[in-house]
């Protein structure tokens, strides 16, 4: 079935290549390896990096394209999902038609192309969310348990996307002739988790202020001088999502109350193995029965902004307080990508504690499936 559909979209030769590449073994990379490799962005290293991506990206992209064709409950035929599949097939075609990379000019041309591929895939998450939303509207009786298969696919799909974007972004960033201090590509070798948490919290409060007119305070505790190597954009995204959920929960709970809204507390702890960031709120918590659902892509405690009047063209521009229920599961994937994790503990009637664990060691390879 999958091959037939891919044959309809691509030439016979290219469709066979998709199938062939989709069966090949992926090669995982660790944060430490990326750092060691990025220490010297010499022309030789950039050439090796481009040659690796030229071989690796088609394998990863082909796997996802094939999987997008074989989703249960008719999800593969939803217009939004077909659009995403076509982006993946276009990117596969671009990569496979690029000639062997032998010199600096080849490498620069390749870098320009993968940069365009990254932009092409910018809106994959909201467009896939629209496809899921279309399915939920058709099958309103589906419980999240029934959709376990789709949830597992989305975990694999989004984890793969994080990896693809990290590899491309890292390669492109190594070309920067004037990188910011202490940066090796995307990686900040002396990142202050406190500083990133502060910026992310202010961004989350800003959205709350726009939506509600006021926002609870966020207090941050920890050693301001502590730094470790990590990807600041990843950490910002994770803390932003956690704080956004917390400020919304507290704001809605205390909106009509005479009491002052209690602050969100962020604690940064630096252990030997992990850096742990705890985000605590008094927003009323989540019922115990709802806790397993918060890590699924089909559940949100807030109104879902992906209504039927949205199209794949404008869905990505929707910026609301609640998002589309993907922030928590995707944050956990970002944490796990470099060997960390995200746990959430809730006290119904009081509040929620989120524990974001980040590996300090940097030697865990990408979790590829």
What are these regions (language model features)?
Residues 265-267, 343-345, 355:
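Short beta-strand patches within cytosolic ATPase/nucleotide-binding catalytic cores
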Residues 274, 285, 325, 347-355, ...:
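Glycine-rich nucleotide-binding loop
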Residues 301, 359-364:
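Two-component histidine kinase transmitter core
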Residues 231, 244-282, 306-315, 320:
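ATP-lid-like helix-loop hinge signature
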Residues 286-314:
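Short conserved segment of the HATPase_c
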